[in-house]
């Protein structure tokens, strides 16, 4: 029989030879490369409508389209609202603006007329009285033009953002019907200058009925033509303005 022969082990550590690593060929990975793992049916994303249980990894266009539609809808609403509001505001403010414009034009027109007449008299007279009156009336006319500018008449001091006047109109607190001429007459600037103009009218003894053309039997000197006939001939028939 053979005996097991015990071979003495050397005192040194026995080291196994390491095998050299074989380089991996990647030349065909683009053709035979590994594919992603198969989807698993774990039921987590079935509520999202994915039959394989895998959520949609692409960003959905729904939020972007929703935001776009909301923005376009907002713009369309603002555009439509502006067109309706602007037209409505214009219709409501046109009447009052027209009355204010007529009264302001009358104030400036009378002062310019007085200034022109005084200037002619001052040029024909050598007295200092007419020269002083000329300077006074010219200054008065210039001040009226400055204070009755559009931006000052419609300043925030007199009007609110909604277009309602801030100044007191007679009869408004009592519940009486207030019309545009009442509002225009109560405007502080117009009230001031209409008072000044009235003083000038009294000072120079002006006939306002004659200046406003209310005489029915006005005859042109040398022509004997009535004013009504002239108006019809030039196509400017006089009409009453009811505000």
UniProtKB/Swiss-Prot annotation:
One of its GO terms (biological process) is protein maturation. Disulfide bonds: none annotated. The keyword Cytoplasm applies. Residues 8-22 have a biased composition (Polar residues). InterPro entries: Essential_protein_Yae1_N, Yae1-like. Residues 73-113 are annotated as: deca-GX3 motif. Residues 1-49 are annotated as: Disordered. The keyword Ribosomal protein does not apply. It is found in: Cytoplasm; Nucleus. One of its GO terms (cellular component) is nucleus. Keywords: Cytoplasm, Nucleus. May form a complex with LTO1. PANTHER family: PROTEIN YAE1 HOMOLOG (PTHR18829:SF0). Belongs to the YAE1 family. The complex LTO1:YAE1 may function as a target specific adapter that probably recruits apo-RPLI1 to the cytosolic iron-sulfur protein assembly (CIA) complex machinery. May be required for biogenesis of the large ribosomal subunit and initiation of translation. This is Protein yae1. The gene is yae1.
């Amino acid at each position: 029989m053979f005996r097991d022969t015990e071979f003495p082990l050397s005192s040194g550590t026995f080291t196994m030879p390491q095998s050299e690593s074989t380089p991996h060929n990647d030349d065909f990975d683009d053709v035979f490369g590994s594919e992603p793992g198969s989807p698993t049916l774990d039921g987590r994303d079935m509520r999202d409508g994915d039959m394989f249980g895998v959520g949609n990894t692409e960003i959905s266009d729904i939020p972007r389209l929703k935001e776009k539609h909301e923005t376009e809808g907002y713009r369309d609403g603002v555009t439509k609202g502006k067109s309706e509001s602007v037209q409505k505001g214009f219709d409501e403010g046109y009447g009052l603006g027209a009355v204010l414009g007529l009264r302001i034009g009358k104030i400036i027109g009378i002062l310019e007329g007085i200034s022109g007449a005084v200037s002619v008299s001052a040029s024909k007279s050598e007295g200092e009285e007419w020269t002083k009156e000329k300077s006074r009336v010219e200054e008065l006319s210039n001040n009226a033009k400055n204070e009755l500018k559009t931006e000052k008449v419609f300043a925030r001091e007199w009007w609110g953002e909604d277009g309602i006047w801030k100044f007191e109109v007679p009869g408004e607190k009592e519940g009486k019907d207030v019309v545009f001429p009442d509002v225009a007459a109560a405007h502080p600037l117009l009230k001031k200058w209409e008072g000044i103009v009235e003083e000038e009218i009294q000072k120079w003894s002006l006939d306002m009925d004659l200046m406003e053309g209310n005489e029915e039997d006005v005859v042109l000197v040398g022509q004997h033509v009535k004013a009504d006939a002239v108006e019809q001939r030039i196509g400017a028939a006089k009409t009453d303005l009811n505000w």
